[in-house]
């Protein structure tokens, strides 16, 4: 999985929004320590979390499984633009068979699938991938029908935009060891991709 933060709102946008409430602009230090502390105090300590919604982050996420994508979509206050299987399944048409299930073919399958810590599950995922390949390349089934045979482990690619308040909620829930392992990995990757000067707002959300 690869996560890149493509764009983000500067912190001073949030501090200026907060200062609008009290008309305390004269106390600003132009995005310095005072303003950063203000955002944390008002947004995190005093729980006026709506002030954090002024901060927005735009991520590119590569290599997330379709199964994990379903869980990501449950965090509704966010925007997702996802690689279309209807238009991109042609990537499998010219690929050679993934059988037999040997080390070489399993490694080839990793280009398309997220593997887990269970060899039997991974083997069944590769068989599902092979069935999908056969539908596309040998039976010439259209993408919009063949997509129903896609394994949950199939990798996707998306643009993901979320505000700081919603991201805090996501990190709190998905960094827990009760979350799906792939979602735990995503939570860590999103945090790590944040600009360093923003991470202090989210540190208390991480469960491990």
From Swiss-Prot:
Gene3D superfamilies named in the record: 3.30.1360.170
Coiled coil residues, start to end: none
Motif (ThyX motif): 74-84
Ranges for domain ThyX: 1-208
Residues annotated as binding FAD: 50, 74-76, 163-165, 169
Entries under CDD domains matching the protein: ThyX
Active site positions, chain numbering: 174 (involved in ionization of n3 of dump, leading to its activation)
Alphabetical keyword list: FAD, Flavoprotein, Methyltransferase, NADP, Nucleotide biosynthesis, Transferase
Top-level enzyme category: transferase
Signal peptide residues on this chain, from the entry's feature table: none
HAMAP family: ThyX
Family: Belongs to the thymidylate synthase ThyX family.
Further remarks about this protein from its record: ThyX activity is mechanistically distinct from ThyA activity.
Subunit structure and binding partners: Homotetramer.
The protein's name: Flavin-dependent thymidylate synthase
Organism: Helicobacter pylori (strain ATCC 700392 / 26695)
């Amino acid at each position: 999985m690869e996560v890149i933060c493509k764009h983000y709102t500067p912190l001073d946008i949030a501090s200026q929004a907060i200062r609008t409430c009290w008309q305390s602009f004269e106390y600003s230090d132009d995005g310095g320590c005072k303003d950063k502390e203000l955002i944390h105090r008002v947004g995190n300590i005093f729980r006026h979390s709506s002030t954090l919604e002024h901060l927005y982050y735009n991520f590119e996420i590569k290599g997330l499984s379709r199964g994990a994508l379903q869980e990501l979509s449950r965090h509704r206050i966010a925007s997702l633009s996802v690689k279309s299987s209807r238009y991109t399944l042609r990537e499998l048409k010219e690929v050679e068979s993934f059988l037999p299930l040997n080390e070489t073919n399993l490694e080839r399958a990793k280009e398309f699938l997220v593997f887990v810590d269970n060899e039997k599950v991974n083997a069944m995922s590769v068989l599902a991938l092979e069935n999908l390949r056969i539908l596309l390349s040998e039976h010439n089934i259209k993408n919009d029908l063949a997509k129903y045979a896609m394994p949950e482990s199939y990798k996707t690619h998306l643009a993901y935009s979320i505000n700081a308040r919603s991201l805090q909620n996501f990190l709190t829930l998905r960094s827990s060891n009760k979350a799906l392992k792939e979602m735990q990995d995503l939570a860590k990757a999103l945090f790590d991709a944040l600009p360093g000067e923003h991470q202090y707002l989210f540190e208390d959300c991480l469960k491990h």
